Amino acid sequence: MRVAVDGEAMQDAHGFMAKLRGSAPVCPVSEARQPAAALVTRYEDVRALLADGRVRHDVRSKAEREAAAERRELTPREELMYWALGGSMIYRDPPDHTRLRRLVNQAFTPRAVERLRPRLSAVADELVAAFAPGATVDLVGEFAVPLTTLAICELLGIPQDGRGAFWGWAQAINDAEAGDGYYEALAEAVEYLSALIERKRVNPGTDLLSELIAVSDEDGDRLSADELVATSLLLLIAGHDTSVHLIANAVLCLLTSPDQLAALRADPSLVDNVVEEVLRYESPVNILPTRFAGSSIELAGGTIPEGETVLLSVLSANRDESVFPDPDRFDITRSAAGHLAFGHGIHYCPGAPLARLEGRLAVAALITGSPHLRLAVAPDELR
């Protein structure tokens, strides 16, 4: 019998995952996009599988094999999805992943992220200064989205006239229930990025996308046009949405933990700790992108059969009481080192430095510029 991972279960995601950690750490489940999967919830198991070569990421090849077994071809929508997303390193296995990561890492460096600091810091302060005194503010719409949209667009070199659509695309592509909107957003994003890449080939700038176009290894290997689109989409989808959630979660955690907020105000140098504890305590991503078992895997007294989809819950792993003492307490003085919010192993999130920078600058700007910030509604009214 498979357990449904649906909206009802996710109403109390932490409670749901805690029960599974205790009773079924490797649980057969069904969810919106994966009718048959194994959900892994314990820290030790999640971390082990993140570094296990038997867990595969090439979902396009898996989909093609399944379609062939059903004596059919991939639908046009499936072709779009697997072409657009399957070309990024997150959905590739070695040696393809190794090659892509090596090329991307040449351009997407800590220095490239650090160059954004002055601009993002100034914009964060400007957004907070624009809050009307005593007014109710939509923190996501008026602060987190504009800040993170600016970050990813400045990083990639997206022109001003193309930035308005990015948040809508990211929302639709990340929404498991978007239906037609998912494919429409994906097609629009692919069309826009493909055209932009060709323009930057002719007129390169100092942005990441221009640098990704230019990078090559010692053998002259470069990213193909498809790989450039897929990598840009990865940054848009995974990076943008995750950073919005990180900022929103940070503010919610602080405002619902007055003692921790007071500690931060007393010692602003704790802002780095705040971001790491938020990443642990309220991970922006619950379940990491789809993987599958390349061969049968014995784990935690159970078996994940070959070909089964593997869902790794970092949200659950980061609340595992065997690793983090008193895990359901938000504590900005604890060492949250070792959390899995950005993954682990060769697929560790390349955008982690950017997300951390955005989170730190956002929290610092809000604490400094809005000393009387408080929730406008009860926490249980938020969604």
Language-model segments: which ranges?
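Cytochrome P450
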Residues: 1-383
